[in-house]
């Protein structure tokens, strides 16, 4: 799913597919080819009543994904696919098998403030969420050096509490092309597969 469905890449709107929803479908297709049952939620959570509202989007997204998890309780992994926002001169690109590939970043909410846990944002899956990101980060360092940026930790929850294996993944930034972002889906699907199968 995509809390921020309106996030696009450098070649949008000329390339009408250069957005995170199309990117998510690409990842879903690759995972299906590996034998996974994938539900790709293409709902728009960040554009309501004719206005872009990225802060309220997490509330809307929680309602949406909670409903889906009730409907499909066998879902074990929940991925929120985004693209980052960086300064215009920043290029988040590496090369994998000769292909220019957008760098990815695992983004983890800690449900913590400097004073301790944020009581109104409990996350019983916090350790498992962090372990999931760290497993993929470590695997990527060995198999796809340069693919991942540092794991980003922030104080809120970002709906990662819904499953033990939840991840918010930033794929490139607004300065990347869609082709670069799409190229990152193959190694990302491979990392997910290896972590989930333990192989």
Model-predicted segments: where are they?
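Active-site-adjacent mobile loop/cap segments within catalytic or ligand-binding domains
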Residues: 146-199
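A short, glycine/acidic-enriched catalytic loop
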Residues: 87-124
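Loop/turn elements at helix/coil->beta-strand transitions in domains of secreted/extracellular proteins
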Residues: 34-37, 73-77, 101-103, 146-147, ...
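Alpha-helical scaffolding within the catalytic cores
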Residues: 65, 88-94, 151-157
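N-terminal catalytic or cofactor-binding beta/alpha core of small enzyme domains
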Residues: 1-76, 84-90, 186, 196-198
């Amino acid at each position: 799913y995509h809390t921020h469905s309106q996030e696009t890449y450098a070649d949008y709107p000329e390339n009408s597919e250069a957005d995170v929803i199309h990117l998510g479908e690409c990842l879903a297709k690759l995972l299906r080819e590996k034998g996974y049952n994938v539900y790709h939620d293409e709902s728009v959570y960040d554009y309501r009543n004719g206005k872009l509202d990225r802060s309220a989007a997490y509330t809307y997204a929680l309602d949406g994904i909670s409903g889906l998890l009730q409907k499909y309780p066998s879902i074990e992994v929940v991925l929120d696919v985004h693209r980052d926002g960086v300064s215009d001169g920043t290029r988040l690109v590496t090369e994998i098998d000769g292909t220019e590939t957008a760098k990815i970043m695992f983004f983890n909410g800690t449900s913590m403030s400097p004073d301790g846990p944020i009581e109104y944002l409990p996350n019983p899956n916090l350790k498992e969420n962090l372990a999931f990101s760290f497993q993929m980060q470590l695997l990527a360092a060995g198999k796809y050096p340069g693919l991942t940026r540092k794991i980003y930790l922030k104080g809120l929850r970002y709906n990662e509490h819904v499953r033990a294996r939840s991840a918010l993944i930033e794929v490139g930034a607004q300065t990347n092309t869609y082709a670069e972002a799409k190229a990152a889906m193959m190694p990302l699907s491979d990392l997910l597969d290896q972590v989930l199968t333990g192989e």
